[in-house]
């Protein structure tokens, strides 16, 4: 001990006796603690301290460490190590307040997206220090994301926003929920046509997507409804003069996807309800097949129940509610309940007349290879402004067609074009006289009153028609109103089970004004009724992206005076059929 003290004092005296140098190197300026992990590069290159003083400091520290080790005292280094950042390559100096213990490794956590590693070996840059190795890992967490709403969400996001600059659904009110950080990346091979060579890894993001998507979408609609009643909730849609797009809402920024030559790189981030850009949630074709395969048999049978309900009124309402609940719980282990219900329904199906079975076979349509190839080309890569079909004073671009991809939201152009195809078909014998109003009709009527849409029916007498279809768009959701002039009633059909009494009242008042203008007579409003279809009376969507498809298929079945018997699992086929129908301007 005394020898050690003598050695230290001797070193100090020798240094004090030496003359001070004429010019000393400038010291590096200290950085504040706030800039410890700054990505900015310090451009001031200042020479380091002179080696002699640096040598002395390290000798003192080394001596103190040896003394502490001799007496068994814990020793802490209060040095200012140089930290090399892995994300930007700059050197950052830790503040003097940072304390690093002599444990084998230490971990510091800060906010950000990169990691910094600090390794102090037995030798310092000057070759003197031999204190233990210290490893400091600075892991920066993923930043919390706030997304735009379908987010889905999907996705996210947000969901690759709508091509060709149509009316967009911008943000999801649920986007304020934080993301859970997850550091995992998966490169996945996907076949556009459902090839066999690829296997999907087990992804946390996709667990329960189909299970929760409908509930999340319903919450979004409730939030939007509250905003419509006078709250300060910001509008989720920006309007364009030509069309409206909805994909932004369910896609997530964290769900980045590339579909080049069948390869998709997905950064797995837990899919919370943030309507994200929600590039929101786009699932692959294989995911869709896996989802639909598990539900196909059940939904076919449920379709029978929907169909049977049309002939028996409200008798089956309790059973149907249970069946819909069972479908929504499909991913949560209710297989036993479903098997029991399926067996009961299959037994009842045997009693259906052959006419009912023939009606169901209408939906079992298979596309030929040539049709599949043509559809794939239309949905494939190409200029988004390329016009693929033109009719009814409407032009359908490749960007519009691509809204018919699975889990994408339909825009105005596609829906208006399809409604015109239904009107053209109704001119054939055996179909009811039909007229379809534009998707922009109701927003214009609601904002400007009858005078704003007075000329929209120029040359058309609505009262000569049997059915009038009115597609309704409310921020991020599509629904349909059917005016049945034969029965003097208005029906509101919503794939999310919402009610539309106020919408029907506005349209009924429009009919009153139209009758005064075109026929100079008043309607007897006491003879007219309006009704919102209940969830057990019409098929309901099980995700957050098919509301536009359900609206089109409601119109298709009603325009043929057919019971609505389709189900959710048929949507992928219906999307492909609609692509072909728009390209060839005729319905299959």
Curated annotation (Swiss-Prot):
Membrane topology: Peripheral membrane protein
Protein name per UniProt: Sentrin-specific protease 2
Pfam family, one: Peptidase_C48
The gene coding this protein: Senp2
Complex and partners: Binds to SUMO2 and SUMO3. Interacts with the C-terminal domain of NUP153 via its N-terminus. Interacts with MTA1. Binds to AXIN1.
GO cellular component: cytoplasm; nuclear body; nuclear membrane; nuclear pore; nucleus; PML body
Any one Gene Ontology BP term: heart development
Keywords for this protein: Cytoplasm, Hydrolase, Membrane, mRNA transport, Nuclear pore complex, Nucleus, Phosphoprotein, Protease, Protein transport, Thiol protease, Translocation, Transport, Ubl conjugation, Ubl conjugation pathway, Wnt signaling pathway
Changes after translation: Polyubiquitinated; which leads to proteasomal degradation.
Region (Protease): 394-558
GO molecular function: deSUMOylase activity; protein domain specific binding; SUMO-specific endopeptidase activity
